[in-house]
């Protein structure tokens, strides 16, 4: 009898998982001219979404860096983790806020500690990116600086003046993230203080800036993350305004997405695949990093949500193989691995008496 009940439960679980994973949920993709008040008529809620917009992605967590496995040197801990990036060899770079030990820590893809640097160098780590030449860029928002390193940790360039916020061509005020266009120009979301985007050429020479504080077109309340797609469109996560604004490389506003909630971090791959980590709205985001957060895969042309999964997160990156790394202020980096056998794992849930992995 017990065996029959288990088999019945297994069948129901598998059916439920299959339906959720394969059936897209209703959603609308608003354009820039759809008023927020009209949004429900268009098929979506501006500051909310179903449990899994688009479709539930078949991913599972393979590793939680900093916990599974625990391979860091004795005495080293993450504290809050602000950002993560990878290099061409698949190594994982973690930017952590605990300043008692090195704040930039490198692992291999299986979580083995490789090296680290930057003890006491950063006031408040924020963004971390790898450029096409495999240099590592770190943004210290409270120190008002942007650093360029080799993968081994050699400092190559420093932009901004330490502990001196400003809004001219050579200073920042709490910069948050960096991205590059096809010509190698850098775009910095600057940030908590200036509420602007700064464009620099590949040598670090000031080119242009745009944006002021506010909620109008082209204004920002907090440009928290930035990304550039294959067509050189510049995406700015205007987090406190619950929107993503998209510009050309000259700072001209092209369109605005208001259906993705309070976006924390964005990443657009060389293959033009877009990933975000987001919350429904600022009320939810005040906790900074909760299980209410979602990682979403987005169509860069339309803004359509292609799939999602629940995950706490602050910043994220992805590999060409589709592995997603999410940096969490809870003190982890989650490695989300595509899992073709995900629905079949329901039997493990029955054996352990817990729901199947999400």
Task: Identify the meaning behind each predicted range.
Residues 8-18:
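Bacterial N-terminal signal peptides
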């Amino acid at each position: 009898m017990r065996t029959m009940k288990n088999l019945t439960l297994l069948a129901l679980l598998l059916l439920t998982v299959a339906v959720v994973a394969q059936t897209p949920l209703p959603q609308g993709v608003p354009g820039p001219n759809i008023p927020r008040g009209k949004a429900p008529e268009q098929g979506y809620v501006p500051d909310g979404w179903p449990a899994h917009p688009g479709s539930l992605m078949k991913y599972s967590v393979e590793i939680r860096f900093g916990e599974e496995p625990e391979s860091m040197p004795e005495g080293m801990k993450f504290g809050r983790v602000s950002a993560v990036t990878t290099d061409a060899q698949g190594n994982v770079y973690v930017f952590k806020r605990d300043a008692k030990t090195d704040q930039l820590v490198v692992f291999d893809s299986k979580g083995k500690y490789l090296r680290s640097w930057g003890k006491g160098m950063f006031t408040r780590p924020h963004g971390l990116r790898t450029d096409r030449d495999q240099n590592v860029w770190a943004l210290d928002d409270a120190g008002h600086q942007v650093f360029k390193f080799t993968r081994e940790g050699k400092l190559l360039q420093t932009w901004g003046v330490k502990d001196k916020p400003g809004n001219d061509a050579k200073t920042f005020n709490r910069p948050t993230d960096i991205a590059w266009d096809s010509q190698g120009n850098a775009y910095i979301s600057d940030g908590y203080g200036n509420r602007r985007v700064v464009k620099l050429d590949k040598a670090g020479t000031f080119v242009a800036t745009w944006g002021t504080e506010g909620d109008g077109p082209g204004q920002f309340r907090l440009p928290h993350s930035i990304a550039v797609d294959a067509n050189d469109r510049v995406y700015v996560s205007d987090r406190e305004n619950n929107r993503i604004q998209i510009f050309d490389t000259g700072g001209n506003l092209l369109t605005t997405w208001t259906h993705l909630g309070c976006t924390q971090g964005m990443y657009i791959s060389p293959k033009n695949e877009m990933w975000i980590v987001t919350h429904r709205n600022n009320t939810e985001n005040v906790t900074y990093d909760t299980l209410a957060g979602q990682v979403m895969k987005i169509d860069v042309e339309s803004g359509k949500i292609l799939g999602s999964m629940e995950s706490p997160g602050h910043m994220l990156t992805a590999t060409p193989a589709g592995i997603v790394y999410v940096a969490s202020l809870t003190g982890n980096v989650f490695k989300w691995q595509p899992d073709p056998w995900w629905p079949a794992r329901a039997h493990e849930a029955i054996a352990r008496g817990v729901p199947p992995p999400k």
